[in-house]
Regions:
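Glycine-rich flexible loops
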Residues: 1-226
Length: 226
């Protein structure tokens, strides 16, 4: 298992995954601060963003941690309470990084590459009361589902599990964000761009209110209490 960790972490595919993760992390329309998480599955391992790390630094410092995928999935099937603490399923117990609390969400999806972002465009729809109905038109033709808000971690993973099919690769998370799933880094990137573009809002013109500075120049209107 340790050899697998070393070999894949040195592969070109892993570097492509880290490059995409970093690019996503540098885009404030997709990720804010230390938010968002990404993963890639390889040789029985689930490489996922570590808790407390920044996606934007994925090519600069150690950001991903390997999880024993089969062990985690077995625990999920058995309702093992440890799945709420994915550090129990690290492939290398000596690794100091802790897997993201949303590791179980990544393990639930069968696709090789999973991107979870807090896309501003997506959230502008996902916060609406009738979001699922409104999203039907812009997302027509995609294999997508709407997931009502659930607490990150196992509750969210269970809700996803109850809604998806093997073909589902776009998940709109109510009041939360967006999940993209694909079988390659390139496909995941392309699908993310497509969904982001489809959900773009028309920018509104902002009118700057006029003020009669002559009337307010000698007043204390800024200090007034309301």
């Amino acid at each position: 298992m340790i050899d697998s960790i070393f070999n894949f972490s040195k592969s070109s595919e892993f570097h492509q995954f880290c490059e995409l993760s970093a690019a996503i992390g540098r885009n404030p329309l997709l990720v804010q601060g230390a938010g968002g998480n990404t993963s890639v599955k390889e040789d029985g391992l689930l490489w996922v963003k570590a808790s407390g790390t920044w996606l934007s630094e994925a090519t600069e410092k150690k950001t991903m941690v390997a999880v024993d995928l089969a062990k985690l999935q077995r625990a999920m099937a058995q309702n093992d309470e440890r799945v709420e603490k994915p550090q129990y399923f690290k492939a290398d117990p000596a690794e100091s990084l802790r897997p993201s609390i949303e590791t179980v969400v990544h393990a639930t999806l069968k696709h090789r590459v999973v991107l979870h972002v807090h896309c501003v465009e997506t959230i502008s729809w996902a916060v609406l009361e009738n979001a699922e109905k409104l999203l039907a038109a812009p997302l027509e033709g995609l294999d997508w589902v709407f997931i009502p808000y659930r607490r990150p971690g196992l509750p969210l993973a269970r809700e996803i599990q109850s809604k998806i099919t093997d073909k589902t690769n776009v998940l709109i998370l109510g009041n939360h964000g967006l999940v993209i799933a694909a079988d390659s880094v390139k496909e995941a990137h392309q699908l993310l761009l497509e969904v982001h573009q489809r959900l773009r809002r028309t920018r509104r013109e902002v009118t700057i209110p006029k003020s009669n500075f002559a009337l307010t120049a000698e007043s204390n209107y800024r200090d007034a209490e309301f």
